[in-house]
Regions:
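Extracellular/periplasmic, surface-exposed regions of secreted and cell-surface proteins
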Residues: 1-198
Length: 198
């Protein structure tokens, strides 16, 4: 059993949303070490069940995307105002969201490891669910007359379900009196992803 926890902070988010706690843990149960498994040990070398749960945070935004900025620029053309050419003017930048926070990734996994025939045959199976919550993306469309791009917001959630099966075989034999080692492996996998919130 292993337990971990991260407490991360980022200045890319506004006060009150800068910190996130991201725990994770994993469990393993080696069935082949149990006493009731002894009759199978001459064939099965290792049989282990695994389970894990983990969370991570993503801060893939600009450094100060939550702060509204005011920019200055020269007036176009060669107009003169009060004997000054190219006068400056100020304008507000694109709108921002004051509630940006961490994009959260939650990964759940169960698995099985199997070794047989003096560890020549190996099999590993994993099934997982991966949820990404509060995906950082552009918000709802603004009217074109507004003249500015949409602010970044934590708008979408996506869920991915999948599995992976790996087979492996390794052995050796002699060629011209010298040992020859070889190994073969194959992997089958599939997954489906869909938005659960848009």
């Amino acid at each position: 059993c292993e337990v971990d926890g991260r407490y991360d902070g980022s200045s890319k988010f506004p006060r009150g949303d800068r910190f996130g706690f991201f725990p994770s843990f994993s469990l393993g149960y080696r069935i082949s070490e149990e006493k009731f498994f002894e009759p199978l040990r001459n064939v099965v070398d290792n049989l282990k069940l695994r389970a894990s749960y983990g969370t991570l945070g993503n801060q893939d935004v600009g450094s100060y995307d939550y702060i509204q900025s005011i920019n200055t620029q020269k007036v176009m053309g060669n107009y003169t105002f009060d004997k000054v050419s190219g006068a400056d003017y100020a304008y507000a930048d694109n709108p921002v969201s004051g509630a940006l926070t961490w994009e959260k990734v939650i990964h759940k996994n169960v698995g099985l490891d199997l070794s047989m025939l003096s560890s020549r045959l190996n099999l590993s199976f994993d099934a997982y669910i991966r949820d990404v919550k509060g995906i950082l993306t552009q918000g709802k469309s603004l009217p074109s007359i507004y003249g500015a791009a949409e602010p970044m917001v934590n708008a979408n959630d996506i869920r991915t379900k999948g599995w992976e099966l790996t087979f492996g075989w390794r052995d050796s034999f002699k060629i011209a009196g010298r040992p020859f080692h070889y190994s073969l492996s194959a992997t089958l996998a599939d997954y489906k992803a869909k938005y659960t919130k848009v």
